[in-house]
A protein has these predicted regions:
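Gly/Ser-rich, low-complexity
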Residues: 1-72, 88-97, 107-177, 216-221, ...
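Hydrophobic alpha-helical transmembrane segments in multi-pass membrane proteins
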Residues: 67, 71, 75, 79, ...
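Membrane-water interface regions at transmembrane-helix termini and the short interhelical loops
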Residues: 81-94, 182-186, 214-215
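Elongated alpha-helical scaffolds
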Residues: 102-105
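Hydrophobic alpha-helical transmembrane segments of integral membrane proteins
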Residues: 165-215, 234, 238-245
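Hydrophobic alpha-helical bundle architecture
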Residues: 187-191, 220-229
Length: 288
């Protein structure tokens, strides 16, 4: 009878250990997958992310918004010319050089405005190039291999049936947590790209104000926001890389309970920090 009880206990322990290791291995595989997916998403340019959406945004920007921006630029240039003429004693002291300077400045503004879409895309090409270079380094240093879990499995083999059952239930809950985290990351990464498209569609309007000292703050702040959104992808990638390294430390710690609940804590921390990356990027570039 004792033999049967021991056999049943050992069989249940093996079953639970296999279930726990399966959950944890799947959990850590999810970490690697998330790092790869985020690196691919935030490292993609707006043109490559979705060709159909990109074409739509370009048409809206160049056919609907650009003519309105042309009117804005006309107002800005006229306002600046009048202001320049009135500065010299109500046109009594007229300097022809100022007219040449105004013509040159207006011509540059028209050239920039007519190429606004390409300039905006160049900003994102630069940021995506930096992100793509960083993604290769980050992915190579955060991969979690199966041999890291060998020590953890040895610890589980020395535990009783009751604690193993509790750990199995907890590890199953963590799997659900990781799926929720995946949804949050999906919303944040895709939301960032949609924000990029929205900012790009209206780009000519703030760019039209850049040539004026008084009104140029609108255009300058837009460019700062543009760089902030572009390099937000870098901050997202850094957050996930830090998370993966912390998870790697859990996997090699040999403490099953700590591994499970540490993963919960780090997952919540990751989601919290991902939502703060936009604000951090804006503070770095001085956008508001």
């Amino acid at each position: 009878m004792d033999f049967l009880t021991d056999w049943l206990t050992n069989w249940l322990k093996e079953l639970l250990i296999g279930g726990i290791m399966g959950n944890l291995e799947g959990l850590f595989d999810t970490v690697n997958t998330q790092v790869g997916e985020i690196a691919a998403q935030v490292g993609t340019t707006p043109a490559a992310w979705n060709a159909g959406v990109f074409s739509l945004i370009r048409q809206l920007s160049e056919t609907v918004i650009l003519p309105i921006a042309g009117l804005v630029l006309t107002f800005v240039a006229t306002y600046e010319l009048i202001q320049m003429l009135l500065e010299k004693n109500n046109m009594h002291e007229f300097d022809v050089a100022n007219i040449y300077k105004w013509v040159f400045k207006t011509a540059c503004a028209i050239l920039i405005l007519s190429n606004t879409f390409d300039i905006v895309m160049a900003v994102f090409d630069v940021s995506q190039s930096v992100i793509a270079d960083a993604a290769g380094l980050i992915q190579g240093s955060t991969d979690i291999t199966p041999d890291m879990l060998a020590e953890l499995e040895t610890t589980l083999e020395g535990m009783d049936l009751g604690p193993l059952l509790g750990l199995w239930l907890q590890s199953s809950v963590i799997g659900l947590t990781m799926q929720i985290m995946g949804i949050i990351i999906f919303v944040l990464v895709y939301g960032r790209m949609i924000e990029i498209y929205l900012m790009t569609s209206l780009a000519p309007l703030p760019v039209a104000t850049l040539s004026n000292r008084e009104l140029g703050g609108t255009g300058q702040n837009y460019l700062k926001s543009l760089f902030a959104v572009g390099f937000q992808g870098m901050l997202i990638l850094v957050c996930v890389a830090i998370y993966a390294v912390l998870i790697q430390g859990i996997a090699t710690g040999g403490d099953p309970i700590g591994a499970i609940w540490g993963t919960v804590g780090y997952t919540v921390l990751l989601c919290f920090m991902l939502f703060k990356t936009g604000g951090i990027a804006q503070r770095i570039f001085g956008a508001h």
